[in-house]
Amino acid sequence: HPAAATSFVMAAVAENGKHAAPNGNGKNGHADPNADAVPPADGLQLARRTGVHAARFALGGILTALFLRRAKFLNLHRGTTPYEAASRVVSVVHATVASIRSLQLAHARGGLKSPFTLFDPWLSGAQGSAPNTAEESEVFAFSSGYWIADLLYLLGYERDPLFVLHHVLTLTIWPQSMASGRGAAVPTLACALGEASTPFLGLWWLAKRAGNTTLEAPLSNAFTASFLPLRVGLLPMYALAFLRAAFSGKLDAVLGAARARLWAVLIAAAGAGSLVWAKALVAGFLKAQKSVKA
């Protein structure tokens, strides 16, 4: 059942949250640079937790697909649709949890003082350059587990090149941050910007495939309204600022020169992918509006 799969994944987050120490707070309520730092030695433990999350996401997807195969009243039971729909249900769960938690963690680091510090990545400041906290690493393990499970699904069923590249990108940055215990500001903000519109995309896909015209149009509008400013506006702006900071040497002390430049190029690639996707999205949106008027 989709609700059961959602509860299943949420329980995983709650269980792993028990192991994470709360963020330390400074005088202004932001993260203490020295609080709850995760040493690189904990990388093996985080890898195990990532694997557990991946297994839970995969199991949740399988259970959801089995339910949809039998729940003919939802009109998502034909052919490979149950598997594709289950992937969207799990995606909605992950994106909702990860984007909200990432936004909270970005705020804890002081990253929301200015407009997402778009023109000066806050990694160069004291708050941003502080070691990763246990809570941040738990969220990274949660997201990495999802991307591993979904990547296996994509390779087996849909094989969408854009999404495969997206998952490879994230599975480069997120685990590196967990293993090194540094640079949490980058995946935190990237996830907050990149995943916030995903729930609308998943729900729109489900409504469209099920033939629910009542929900399809408003969900499409909600996705477009959230995707364009976040993924076409803010994310490319942040990627450009991150590129400048990385190649100017400002982030060398935090991430190391090679890692800073690698992450900057990957974030820029994500921004470019968003622009390509947006072009197709806007074209489809305008086409749909013309058909409605006709």
Predicted regions and their residues:
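Short, Lys/Arg-enriched N-terminal segments with co-localized hydrophobic residues
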Residues: 1-9
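Membrane-helix and juxtamembrane interface regions of eukaryotic multi-pass membrane proteins
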Residues: 11-18, 23, 27-193, 198-201, ...
